[in-house]
């Protein structure tokens, strides 16, 4: 079997950032898949499943309610490797286009207070697997160290 494109990416050189993972054409429209990479693969500890799950709930809720983008949001979900998230949007985008949106999203997570949306047993398949304090910590770290100081190497995959 052929290696799929995401397994051909040089994870040894990959930094934290926002990357265009792929673009698909569905019904005449482009769907852009972003790699929202919060941890350097194989070089730093991965995100814990509880905080990543909380980030998923908060980011998905925020984005699907965003006044400008809610109709363009397709999906937000965690990577199996626990180093970040995949984010799919209708439209032909580059990473720089969504940097302000990601800054807003991670500020929302960092500043969130109260009950995390969708964490009741009827709403979630694993409602006990959440950690809001750590989600807020990871959101702040990603904002401060990556999103608020992003350079080209945080926005384009290494060659």
From Swiss-Prot:
<feature type="binding site">
    <location>
        <position position="57"/>
    </location>
    <ligand>
        <name>Fe cation</name>
    </ligand>
</feature>
<keyword id="KW-0456">Lyase</keyword>
<comment type="subunit">
    <text>Homodimer.</text>
</comment>
<feature type="binding site">
    <location>
        <position position="124"/>
    </location>
    <ligand>
        <name>Fe cation</name>
    </ligand>
</feature>
<comment type="function">
    <text>Involved in the synthesis of autoinducer 2 (AI-2) which is secreted by bacteria and is used to communicate both the cell density and the metabolic potential of the environment. The regulation of gene expression in response to changes in cell density is called quorum sensing. Catalyzes the transformation of S-ribosylhomocysteine (RHC) to homocysteine (HC) and 4,5-dihydroxy-2,3-pentadione (DPD).</text>
</comment>
<comment type="similarity">
    <text>Belongs to the LuxS family.</text>
</comment>
<keyword id="KW-0673">Quorum sensing</keyword>
<feature type="binding site">
    <location>
        <position position="53"/>
    </location>
    <ligand>
        <name>Fe cation</name>
    </ligand>
</feature>
<protein>
    <recommendedName>
        <fullName>S-ribosylhomocysteine lyase</fullName>
        <ecNumber>4.4.1.21</ecNumber>
    </recommendedName>
</protein>
<dbReference type="Pfam" id="PF02664">
    <property type="entry name" value="LuxS"/>
</dbReference>
<dbReference type="InterPro" id="IPR011249">
    <property type="entry name" value="Metalloenz_LuxS/M16"/>
</dbReference>
<keyword id="KW-0071">Autoinducer synthesis</keyword>
<dbReference type="GO" id="GO:0009372">
    <property type="term" value="P:quorum sensing"/>
</dbReference>
<dbReference type="GO" id="GO:0005506">
    <property type="term" value="F:iron ion binding"/>
</dbReference>
<dbReference type="GO" id="GO:0043768">
    <property type="term" value="F:S-ribosylhomocysteine lyase activity"/>
</dbReference>
<dbReference type="InterPro" id="IPR037005">
    <property type="entry name" value="LuxS_sf"/>
</dbReference>
<dbReference type="InterPro" id="IPR003815">
    <property type="entry name" value="S-ribosylhomocysteinase"/>
</dbReference>
<keyword id="KW-0408">Iron</keyword>
<keyword id="KW-0479">Metal-binding</keyword>
């Amino acid at each position: 079997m052929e290696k799929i494109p995401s397994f051909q990416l040089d994870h040894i050189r990959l930094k934290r950032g926002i990357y265009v993972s792929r673009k698909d054409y569905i019904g005449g429209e482009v769907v852009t898949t972003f790699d929202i990479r919060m941890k350097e693969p194989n070089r730093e500890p991965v995100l814990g499943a509880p905080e990543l799950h909380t980030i998923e709930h908060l980011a998905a809720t925020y984005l699907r309610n965003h006044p400008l983008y809610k109709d363009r949001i397709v999906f937000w979900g965690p990577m199996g490797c626990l180093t970040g998230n995949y984010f799919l949007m209708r439209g032909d985008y580059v990473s720089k286009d969504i940097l302000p949106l990601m800054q807003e999203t991670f500020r929302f997570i960092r500043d969130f207070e109260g009950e995390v949306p969708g964490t009741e047993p009827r709403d979630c398949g694993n409602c006990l697997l959440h950690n809001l304090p750590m989600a807020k910590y990871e959101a702040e770290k990603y904002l401060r160290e990556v999103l608020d100081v992003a350079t080209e190497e945080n926005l384009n995959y290494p060659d």
